[in-house]
């Protein structure tokens, strides 16, 4: 499984990049707005930190304008992937961008049907949102499992980015059912590091070492 980090905070990206586990980054307009910085400036800095796919989202909701935005975004760096919302205009844009050889990530996927349409249109990645589905009393992981099964059945090459990750259990479940990628917030990465028995074991090692050197 590959790990992306879901943030536009460069300090968070730098921290996790040093662990040697990052394969890419996903951003969106909301995350970039929180940083209070110019979009291009933020994306350029992220690309200098992580050598992997960097998803940057278009703002327009008309396919022609999405394509125009995408052409500008890919000028920033060769690793840019164009993030497009799941909608009719989005699919039109994905189809056109695929013909131009531009990689795409279709976001806001909430059903396997949507994922199938996005893949058929040529999406490089599809992003089902686990946490938001859990929020309405359903099972986000079932969606990921359904998409994995369908893509496997038909040899579909679009990769599945498990998004809206809220807990380490979400990451574990995605890995269990075969999600290709988990895009994980910094907070959840930090939680994945921790286990009380690990902490206790380290404390015990230190106590034993000190007692040996008295």
Curated annotation (Swiss-Prot):
Domain of life of the source: Bacteria
Keywords attached to this entry: Cytoplasm, Pentose shunt, Schiff base, Transferase
CDD domains named among the record's database cross-references: Transaldolase_FSA
EC number: 2.2.1.2
GO biological process: carbohydrate metabolic process; pentose-phosphate shunt
Subcellular location: Cytoplasm
Pathway(s) per entry: Carbohydrate degradation; pentose phosphate pathway; D-glyceraldehyde 3-phosphate and beta-D-fructose 6-phosphate from D-ribose 5-phosphate and D-xylulose 5-phosphate (non-oxidative stage): step 2/3
A Pfam family recorded for this sequence: TAL_FSA
GO molecular function terms listed in the Swiss-Prot or TrEMBL record: aldehyde-lyase activity; transaldolase activity
Recorded family membership: Belongs to the transaldolase family. Type 3B subfamily.
Role according to the record: Transaldolase is important for the balance of metabolites in the pentose-phosphate pathway.
Protein's UniProt name: Probable transaldolase
Species whose genome carries this gene: Clostridium tetani (strain Massachusetts / E88)
Higher taxonomy: Bacteria, Bacillati, Bacillota, Clostridia, Eubacteriales
Gene designation per UniProt: tal
